[in-house]
Each structure stands twice: as C-alpha cells, then as structure tokens.
C-alpha cells in the first residue's frame, strides 16, 4: 500500500468514527434539541456518505488499488460510473447543505418561529436538496470507465474537445454561483445576528453566538476550499485527483471537528459520558484529596 493511501485511511477512519459518534450524540442526547443540530446532523450524515463514495474513484487508477478496483468492476461493471455520478451529486449536496446551514442561521436571526419551522421541515429541505443535486448532475457529461482485459488496466473513454469545455464551464459556473451565494448569505447572517443578539439575555446570547460561530466556521472552511477548487479549475496538475480527494476529505470531515472545537455542550456531554474520561477525572480528584489530606 502506497504512503498516500495509508494517510487517507488513517485520518479517514478516525474522522469517520468521530462523525458516526457525533451523529449518534446529536440524535439521542437531550442537550441537542434545537433544530440547528438537526440540520448539522443531516450535513454530517451526507458528508460521511460522500467520503465513503470517494473510495472507488480514488482507487481505480492507483496501482495499490488495482485489486480492489478489479473486484468492484467484476462484481458490478458500472460501479465506477455510479461512484463518479454520485461524486458529482455530492458536490451539489455539500454546497447546498452549507447554504442551508447559513439560511438556518439567517432565518433564526430574523424570525421568532424559525426553530419550529426547521424542526418540522428540515427533512423535507434536505430531500429537496438531494433531488436538486440529482437533477443538476444531468447537465454534466460523464465519461464511462471500462476495463481492458488485454492490457489489464482501467481506462476512461476519451471526451471530445466540446465535451471537455462543457464540463469545465459547468464546474466553473456552479462553483462560482455557490461561492457567491454562500458569501452573500453569510454576510447577511452576520449582520442580522449582531443586530439580533443585543436585546437578549446572557444565556440566549451565548447560544446564538455558539451556533453562529459553528455555522460561520464551517462556512469559512467550505468557502475557502470552494474558492480553491474554482481557481484551480483553470490549472491542470499531474496529481490533481490526489489533491481533489484531500480537499473533498477536508470538506467532509470539517463539521465534526468544528463541533468538537467550538461547541462547549458537545465537549461537556462527551466528558460526562465517556468512562475513560470519568475514571481519569476521579483519579485526579482522589489524588488531589490525598495531597490535601497530607498537607
């Protein structure tokens, strides 16, 4: 196994476990009843599925992934076409989900009954996001991936010049559109949240600030990576696929780490429920008591 694949697996498996843990935590804990956490949970679920779906695409043309790719192809010869199709679907899903998170914060800052609306309709909103993403991909040309049994290697059917130009224009238009939409909504949200926070009590202010910080941190990460993708669509790299996969992983895993860093409730619940942390905490407390008794 090549070093890059080992790196992908090491940080990927750890991050995937963290994401699953966050999904369970946000779904079952009574501390996370706000609709914001329902939206965040959906975002993490979809990003986890996105990461799983990247593996056929990232391994098909790598020498250390040949056995895995050959097995998938012989099991179902459309596996890589489906994976490539879903990768493009997830590009739209991730972008629209980030916009959805921004819209949640914006609507919460403007409307008093926003939490009730999102609690009722967040599943419908994400169903519409997925439907839109599938429809948007229909505009994109997808070159099928096949296996040459004589040469014993995978290959992608060559696209015509018009098809390549069409794909480049498609990506640039959607990336630029998403980037612009995210920036506009994020700035509007920032203005509304600052205006909204003033009249509330200290506890409510802290809640608004915390949720806004999580949303803005995720938006910032996604915006920077989307800007990078947009700019680099004009440049061709020899290792573009490897770079693209790393960027995709950063987007997919970002929300779980942002919650862990910025959400005090998440850290508090983890601290109070993980046996190892509780045992260590008791040992420290016992040691401190012993020292106090000695002195």
Curated annotation (Swiss-Prot):
InterPro entries: 7TM_GPCR_serpentine_rcpt_Srg, NRL-Serpentine_Class_Gamma. Keywords: Membrane, Transmembrane, Transmembrane helix. It comes from the Eukaryota. One of its GO terms (biological process) is sensory perception of chemical stimulus. It comes from Caenorhabditis elegans. One of its GO terms (cellular component) is membrane. It is found in: Membrane. One of its GO terms (molecular function) is transmembrane signaling receptor activity. Pfam families: Srg. The gene is srg-53. It is a multi-pass membrane protein. Belongs to the nematode receptor-like protein srg family. PANTHER family: SERPENTINE RECEPTOR CLASS GAMMA (PTHR31114), SERPENTINE RECEPTOR CLASS GAMMA-RELATED (PTHR31114:SF4). This is Serpentine receptor class gamma-53. The chain crosses the membrane at residues 7-27, 39-61, 121-141, 173-193, 211-230, 241-261.
